[in-house]
Amino acid sequence: MALYEHVVITRPDISPAQVESFIEEMTTFLKEKGATVGKTEYWGLRSLAYPIKKQRKGHYSLINIDGPADAIHELERRQRIAEDVMRYMTVRVETLSDEPSPVLSRKERRRD
């Protein structure tokens, strides 16, 4: 099976709890399709580089996936028709890291 990093941007008007619930739904779906879900990260409400669907902010989330391409295609199909999803991107990678992503670690450094 291949390794993927999947980043999704959801609408800013939903709560972080709803975003976590949405990520759980995606995780459950992927497990049903035979994929293994590694690390999931919620990066928070962040400003977008340019407006998407008349929105200037969005909730960013990352999911590491080890699974078949069929599961990824179906996940992307579902996100294309989901109203809460503004953008998504899936990238195939050579290895998955268990360490916090650079985006999340930079966010933690700012708090200190």
Curated annotation (Swiss-Prot):
Matching SUPFAM superfamilies: Ribosomal protein S6 (SSF54995)
GO biological process: translation
InterPro entries listed in its UniProt record: Ribosomal_bS6 (IPR000529), Ribosomal_bS6_sf (IPR035980), Ribosomal_S6_plastid/chlpt (IPR020814), Transl_elong_EF1B/ribsomal_bS6 (IPR014717)
Any one GO CC term of the record: cytosolic small ribosomal subunit
UniProt keyword Transcription regulation, yes or no: no
Domain of life: Bacteria
Pfam families given in the database record: Ribosomal_S6 (PF01250)
This protein's UniProt keywords: Ribonucleoprotein, Ribosomal protein, RNA-binding, rRNA-binding
A molecular function GO annotation: structural constituent of ribosome
Family stated for the protein in its record: Belongs to the bacterial ribosomal protein bS6 family.
Function: Binds together with bS18 to 16S ribosomal RNA.
Entry protein name: Small ribosomal subunit protein bS6
